[in-house]
């Protein structure tokens, strides 16, 4: 189950806890297609193992939970299908995590941006350190956009005005603001977060599994009822990903310079 970049570990069966650690700290835990697939496989394992009661996701190195998708792969995008296939792949991964039948906790240290932010939002609870930052800064970096489902996750937690604020400005919100907005459940100092998350997970794991499952699935169904099919947003995905601005954003990011966007 584990790979060098995705470490999956199940505690002693008596605890009921499973942990996934994204282990690519040299790249701020940026995700590749293989890493996304390993996350899906971990979700399958969690659902298949009755001894697992709670699933915790975290990033190695202390500087990033996950910083999203490895930007280098975007240099290969040239067609509408490239863009749609990428967003559908990411949607499938995040949706699979969201559908895990056991409670999930994102343990966030450092940044959770782009796809990493989407993964954190797909978890049931988020516990972070004071230095954590959340956001999807594509308006000032790459010039692309999110899938309908990932916009919906932001809307569920932040509401329309705050979602637009976050996306329009491209800013990252710190831990204190994230907690005020309801995005984060708890803030814990870095030297105590492992123990705090383990204690929270153990508390949940002692409770009635069917009640936990029913609560999680009921909330998911209620939220899903407000979402549109991704196909209804394909025109917006293609508009952004096939633009000159997106090509400029990717080139600028890889060259470590500010992008110059022209709206075309």
What spans do the regions from the language model cover?
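Well-ordered beta-strand positions
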Residues: 125, 165, 169-171, 177, ...
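Short, active-site-adjacent cap segments at secondary-structure transitions
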Residues: 62-66, 112-114, 135, 219
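Glycine- (often His-adjacent) and acidic-residue-rich active-site loop
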Residues: 40, 59-95, 140-143, 225
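Conserved CoA-thioester-binding segment of acyl-CoA-metabolizing enzymes
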Residues: 1-58, 95
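CoA-thioester-processing core
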Residues: 93, 97, 107, 113-166, ...
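C-terminal long alpha-helix characteristic of the crotonase
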Residues: 25, 127-132, 184-231, 238, ...
């Amino acid at each position: 189950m584990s790979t060098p970049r995705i470490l999956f570990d199940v505690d002693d069966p008596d605890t009921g806890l499973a942990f996934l650690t994204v282990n690519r700290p040299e790249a701020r835990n940026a995700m590749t297609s293989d890493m996304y697939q390993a996350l899906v496989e971990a979700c399958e394992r969690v659902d298949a193992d009755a001894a697992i009661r709670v699933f915790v996701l975290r990033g190695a190195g202390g500087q990033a939970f996950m910083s999203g998708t490895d930007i280098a792969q975007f240099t290969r995008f040239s067609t509408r299908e490239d863009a749609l296939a990428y967003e559908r792949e990411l949607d499938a991964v995040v949706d699979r995590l969201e559908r895990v039948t056991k409670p999930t906790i994102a343990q966030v240290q450092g940044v959770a941006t782009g796809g990493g932010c989407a993964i954190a939002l797909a978890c049931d609870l988020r516990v972070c350190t004071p230095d954590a930052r959340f956001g999807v800064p594509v308006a000032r970096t790459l010039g692309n956009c999110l899938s309908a489902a990932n916009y919906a996750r932001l809307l569920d937690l932040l509401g329309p005005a705050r979602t637009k604020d976050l996306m329009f400005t491209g800013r990252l919100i710190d831990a204190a603001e994230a907690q005020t907005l309801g995005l984060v459940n708890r803030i814990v100092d870095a030297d105590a977060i492992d123990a705090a998350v383990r204690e929270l997970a153990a508390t949940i794991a002692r409770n009635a599994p069917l009640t936990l499952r029913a609560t999680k699935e009921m909330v998911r169904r209620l939220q899903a009822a407000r979402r549109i099919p991704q196909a209804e947003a394909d025109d917006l995905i293609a508009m952004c990903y096939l633009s000159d601005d997106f090509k400029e954003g990717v080139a600028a990011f890889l060259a470590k310079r500010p992008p110059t966007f022209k709206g075309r």
